[in-house]
From Swiss-Prot:
Homodimer. This is Cytidine deaminase. This enzyme scavenges exogenous and endogenous cytidine and 2'-deoxycytidine for UMP synthesis. Zn(2+) binds at residues 102, 129, 132. Keywords: Hydrolase, Metal-binding, Zinc. One of its GO terms (biological process) is cytidine deamination. It comes from the Bacteria. Belongs to the cytidine and deoxycytidylate deaminase family. It comes from Salmonella agona (strain SL483). The active site is at residue 104. The gene is cdd.
């Protein structure tokens, strides 16, 4: 078990500990539960779906990287597939505050990058900030997305974001988590192709500036992130943050990164290169390349 989970794990009910122990035994537990695992945990612990999600929130919060605020937020995105995806907030010392990943963004991006097609609910241990409410409004689940908070009755995003502004106001039909493939040809080595594949998945209906990042760890593991734009612009999640989020959720550290590649168009309206390189260098990675999408 990764050390970050030990304190939260020790506070779980005994029957839930017994059921979770083999799942968490992998040091690189992927911070997600399959629908089958969720069903097993519900039956073993005697909990309904909502109660189980609340019980697991401390494990999600344990994934937080909060070197600045020391305020850990955990979230669980519940996919329509039945799979659950952990998320936690991330802060990056030496970068800018704008590079921060919020817990809800973390869980949602996690689900999206693992191929989830939509979300039924998000469970989080603190009320979503306005930034995250706006980020969630980009999803194909729309304002019907259920939000669960400890000690409160469940509500929909519509309740938390009244009179919402979103993609429909800009006549955008393809939403975040809808399947997208922008068709750029895969070239280069494995890491380069992974970055291009991530760029092909981008949600960028406002700038039409696709981008993707691939990070290679010293053990050969590759994590990718795709660009996710938002109708309100500022809640947009850059591709590097998506990749760093997956890397961290899987129990890796920034020092494990040995190489990074950004894929983007050289003539795009928005360019990720400077911000991507600056953040990676702040985290200790200097082997950074860029491939231009044709």
């Amino acid at each position: 078990m990764h050390p970050r989970f030990q304190t939260a794990f020790a506070q779980l009910a005994d029957n839930l500990q017994s059921a979770l122990a083999p799942i968490l035994a992998d040091h690189h537990f992927p911070a997600m539960l399959t629908a089958e695992q969720v069903s097993t945990l519900k039956n073993t612990a005697g909990l309904d779906e909502d109660a189980l999600a609340f019980a697991l929130l401390p494990l999600a919060a344990a994934c937080a990287r909060t070197d600045l605020s020391h305020f850990n937020v955990g979230a669980i995105a519940r996919g329509v597939s039945g799979n659950w995806y952990f998320g936690a907030n991330m802060e990056f010392l030496g970068a800018t505050m704008q590079q921060t990943v919020h817990a809800e963004q973390s869980a949602i991006s996690h689900a999206w990058l693992r191929g989830e097609k939509g979300l039924a609910a998000v469970t989080v241990n603190y009320t979503p900030c306005g930034h995250c409410r706006q980020f969630m409004n980009e999803l194909n689940s729309g304002l019907d997305l259920r939000i669960h908070l400890p000690g409160r009755a469940p509500h929909t995003l519509r309740d938390y974001l009244p009179d919402a502004f979103g993609p429909k106001d800009l006549e955008i039909k393809t939403l975040l988590m809808d399947e997208q493939d922008h068709g750029f040809t895969l070239t280069g080595d494995t890491l380069t192709q992974a970055a291009i594949t991530a760029a092909n998945k981008s949600h960028m209906p406002y700038s039409h500036s696709p981008s993707g990042v691939a990070l290679e760890c010293k053990d050969g593991r590759i994590f990718t992130g795709s660009y996710a734009e938002n109708a309100a612009f500022n809640p947009t999640l850059p591709p590097l943050q998506g990749a760093l989020n997956l890397l961290s959720l899987n129990g890796y550290n920034y020092a494990d990164i040995q190489r990074a590649i950004l894929a983007e168009k050289g003539d795009a309206a928005l360019i990720q290169w400077d911000a991507t390189a600056a953040t990676l260098k702040a985290l200790g990675c200097h082997n950074i390349d860029r491939v231009l999408l044709g």
